[in-house]
Amino acid sequence: MSIINKIFISLILVLFTTSLLAEEVKKVGKFKDWETLVLTKSDGIVCFAQSKPVLQSPKKNKRDSRLFVSFRPNEKILDEISLTAGYEFNKQNSITAKSGKFKYKFDISQEKFAWIADNKVEKKMIRTMKKGSRIMISGYNSSGSQTIDHYSLLGFTKAYNEAK
């Protein structure tokens, strides 16, 4: 076998193996302002509903914000609410979600992401999201400036049920 053939076969094997190990995200459905996706990883799948804000403040700073509700069956994690505001959170200030008269605090933040620590609180927030039409997320960046993201909840229930 020539050296060219050996290199060619080795290259094909490397590409094939790499593609098997790569994570794959597949869009399962779009439901008004929400969508459902499935992330396939080597250690299992993550199903999640996500949305982008319909309104952001301040307007001058374009950020890649998202609100998620995730399910990780292999890890026995259900109804995990998380968000990213597109910047690293300030640890001195709270990150909150407000819909109608209900307010929820994100207890954990790491770099650009935040989570709610208590699954009971997550379930309450999900019930609120199913009944509401909009939710407002408030956070603070590393310089202490507040940002507010407004998310539409149109399509949330269908996207949530599809992810579940």
Regions inferred by a protein language model and the residue ranges of each:
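Bacterial N-terminal signal peptides that target proteins for export
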Residues: 1-9
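Short, linear, compositionally biased motifs with a strong N-terminal bias
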Residues: 13-14
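N-terminal signal peptide c-region/cleavage motif recognized by signal peptidases
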Residues: 17-18
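A generic "folded-domain core" signal
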Residues: 22-164
